[in-house]
Amino acid sequence: MPIISLPADPTSPSQSLTPFPIQLDTKDGKAGKLLKQIRIRYLNEPNSRHTPITFINTYGFVYARDTSGGIHSEISSDLAAGSITACMMKLGPGPNIQNANLVLRSLNEFYVKVKKTSSQREEAVFELVNIPTLLREHALCKRKMLVCSAEKFLKNPSKLQAGFEYVYIPTFVSITYSPRNLNYQVARPILKFRSRFVYSIHLELILRLLCKSDSPLMKSYNADRTGRGCLASVWIHVCNILKNKSIKQQGRESYFIAKCMSMQLQVSIADLWGPTIIIKSLGHIPKTALPFFSKDGIACHPLQDVSPNLAKSLWSVGCEIESAKLILQESDLNELMGHQDLITDKIAIRSGQRTFERSKFSPFKKYASIPNLEAIN
């Protein structure tokens, strides 16, 4: 089974995201207070004349709130001691922000209420009651409300109970400067489409989670024999290709490899809508596969939509793309089980964008409180 395996280069700025180190405020002599921090990454070309857009994600904690009312902040007495659970809230794409440090400062103005509800499954509702002026043009801030799967954005949604009011307090913010053409996600109906007239091409990534040997994640994923964390497999639906006469002439395997080589696919990872896999085609895209890519040959796949548990693991640890493979399968489920998968390594791991740097923020730990941003100054 062909596998691409690349060595890590943590010294290269383009191959990592700066981690969120645990920094404690010790001015009052108390331990366990986290300072707010920012992580910045640039995906746009350094000398590009085009103005980039910014993707902003926040990571923090949900707290229970005293229902007696009143204005609160992260140091307010109406918040119950200790967080309920960790949380991620994506603000999505927005305009260029010239001074990224202003984003960190603006977190003090955030007031986000959290509520749990249910339809077909449990859902989390985030209401942005107070939005910093700097961030009002970002996607979520325009809508002022996010209704999403509770499993995707709350570390442990089962801890939220009826009869309580909850607020979300962001602690860490990730801002990614990127070209405008990265603002593209494949529509769900296209990803779910199956037919006996097409083959499905899938991408399997083996991600190395850079956790310690005593991490709880070691029980959830395969241990790496080299001792560098653990390994996780994640599959992504890349595209469909039409079954035609060329298959009979070339053979199924030769046809598959030829299509993969002609597309010249590259894969990378970045913090866009949370941890996101980016697939880019540098070559010819077959007509049947065109709906899976933007006009620039790009497709972004947020990991929380593909594998929520794996995405939440990356809130606290980094990862490396250890290997990448393309798999050809029958699209129709009735034919899928009766045919063997074809596997090839005709996909490149994009140089400089194969590592998702670990964060020292850990959703497995509780912290007493979070200091006001003024403590940073």
Swiss-Prot record:
Keywords: Viral envelope protein, Viral matrix protein, Virion. The keyword Cytoplasm does not apply. Pfam families: Matrix_Paramyxo_C (PF23765), Matrix_Paramyxo_N (PF00661). It is found in: Virion. One of its GO terms (biological process) is virion assembly. It comes from the Viruses. Belongs to the morbillivirus/respirovirus/rubulavirus M protein family. This is Matrix protein. It comes from Human parainfluenza 2 virus (strain Toshiba). The gene is M.
